[in-house]
C-alpha cells in the first residue's frame, strides 16, 4: 500500500505525464503522444478500475454500451447483442436494467470488466481487482481473469497487492 502501483498505472495509461524516463505501450511512446493519438491508443486498451467506475445514473447495460456509442458507428441492435454477450461472459445475465447501486462489490467489478472488454482491446489493465472482495469472490474473479486471458487471447497487466492472486494469474511478476 502506498508504493506507487496505481501511480505507475496512471503513467502507463498517459493519465499523468512522466518527468523522466520512457514508457512505450503498443509500440507508442506514451509521453510524446498528442491528445488525439493518446485517445487512439486508449481505444486499443481496456481498463478495469478498482471500484468498477460505473456511472451511478446509468443502468448496467448503458454503462457497458457507452464505449461503443462513443467510439463506433455500430447500430443499436449490434450494440445490444455485444453488451448481452459480455454480460453473459461475466456471469451477469439479467442485470442489464439494474443500477450500479443495486450490485454487490463483485458484480460491480465484473460489470466494470464487461465495459473494459466491450471494445475488444489488445491489452487489458486491472487496478487492484481483488480490493474490497472477500476471499471466495476474489478467487472467482481470479478464475474469470484467467478465462478471459485464454478465451480472448489478450495480454493482461494487473496492479495488485494480493500476492496470492498475483502468483495465480501472472506468467511474469
Which ranges hold each PLM region?
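Helix-to-loop junction immediately C-terminal to a conserved catalytic motif
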Residues: 13
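Conserved ABC ATPase "signature" region
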Residues: 29, 76-94
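Conserved ABC ATPase signature
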Residues: 99-103, 107
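A short, proline-enriched helix->beta-strand linker immediately N-terminal to the Walker B motif
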Residues: 118-122
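Catalytic Walker B motif of ABC-type/P-loop ATPase nucleotide-binding domains
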Residues: 124-127
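Helix N-cap at the start of a conserved alpha-helix in ABC-type nucleotide-binding domains
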Residues: 135-137
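Helical segment within the ABC ATPase nucleotide-binding domain
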Residues: 139-152
